[in-house]
Amino acid sequence: SHELKTPLTSISGYAELMQEGAVRPEDIRRFSGKIYDEAQRLIALVGDIIRLSQLDSRENLPPRVSTDLWELCETQLAHLEHAARKKAVSLHLVGDRVTVFGAEHILSEMVYNLCDNAIKYNKAGGSVTIELTALPDGAQLCVRDTGIGIPQEEFERIFERFYRVDKSHSREVGGTGLGLSIVKHAAAYHQATISVDSTLGEGTAITLHFPSPAADGFNTDLT
């Protein structure tokens, strides 16, 4: 509720001041900008909440088909190029040209959220690398960064809703706090496993292992 109340309180406060005429004409544009920014935060938050609800219920989700993961990653890195440039972070895609059995839109969200997070918690001059690996039993996607790192005792908690490792800079970093939770639920939808490896002050690697549709126990009819 805190994540919803904070932007709503800001919007209400700025709007009330403007309505009462307690704002100087030269401040109206600035206050309008604040209201717009908080509204955009709410739109993003509601969108992520809806996506999590869909993944939880497995309702209204796109079908899974054979998807070119390399091309998908290229597209998402292109979307993040501006954000990376602002942080002076370089983006890289290396490894094998692999395909996975998945829902393209949800896979795109997974890759975007992982890389967006890696950029936000990175250092100036750092890097974010997606490494794709073809395996006998499927494919592996690893997003590796040179950021602040995560304490080992918090590896599992980073996938909780609204959990942030660096709470003191949550407003500065931005985001909804739901990105990695969406990754976790989307991975489950694709029957993929997640592992985390991180060293404080050096960086983090989050790895997804996607099983082959030919693997034992793989459910191609999962909805």
Model-flagged regions — what are they?
Residues 63-81:
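A conserved beta-strand-to-alpha-helix junction within the catalytic ATP-binding
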Residues 19-26:
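Short acidic helix/loop segment immediately C-terminal to the autophosphorylated histidine
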Residues 37-42:
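Short alpha-helical segment of the dimerization/phosphotransfer core of two-component systems
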